[in-house]
Swiss-Prot record:
Organism per entry: Oryctolagus cuniculus
Protein name, UniProt field: Casein kinase I isoform delta
The encoding gene: CSNK1D
A molecular function GO annotation: protein serine/threonine kinase activity
GO cellular component term of the entry, any: nucleus
Any single GO BP term: regulation of circadian rhythm
Maturation and modification: Autophosphorylated on serine and threonine residues; this autophosphorylation represses activity. Reactivated by phosphatase-mediated dephosphorylation. May be dephosphorylated by PP1.
Domain of life: Eukaryota
Every Protein kinase domain range: 1-81
Reaction catalysed by this enzyme: L-seryl-[protein] + ATP = O-phospho-L-seryl-[protein] + ADP + H(+); L-threonyl-[protein] + ATP = O-phospho-L-threonyl-[protein] + ADP + H(+); L-seryl-[tau protein] + ATP = O-phospho-L-seryl-[tau protein] + ADP + H(+); L-threonyl-[tau protein] + ATP = O-phospho-L-threonyl-[tau protein] + ADP + H(+)
């Protein structure tokens, strides 16, 4: 779940650094043994913040890396406003 509260700015000499926190909902996307992609599941409940969730998430499709990029896009639009 990517949303604005997960991005922190450094202080002082590290003021140009962005820290990303809270990987509580992170999951593996490839099987460690076979290196095959783990199939998506459907009929999943919404996880994370609805405002920044991808369209697939709203449709009940399990989140993937693609959905993380879509959510990041929504967060960047939020920061721009």
């Amino acid at each position: 779940x990517i949303f604005p509260d997960n991005f922190l700015m450094g202080l002082g000499k590290k003021g140009n650094l962005v820290y990303i926190i809270d990987f509580g909902l992170a999951k593996k996307y490839r099987d460690a043994r076979t290196h095959q992609h783990i199939p998506y599941r459907e009929n999943k409940n919404l996880t994370g913040t609805a405002r920044y969730a991808s369209i697939n998430t709203h449709l009940g499709i399990e989140q993937s890396r693609r959905d993380d990029l879509e959510s990041l896009g929504y967060v960047l639009m939020y920061f721009n406003l």
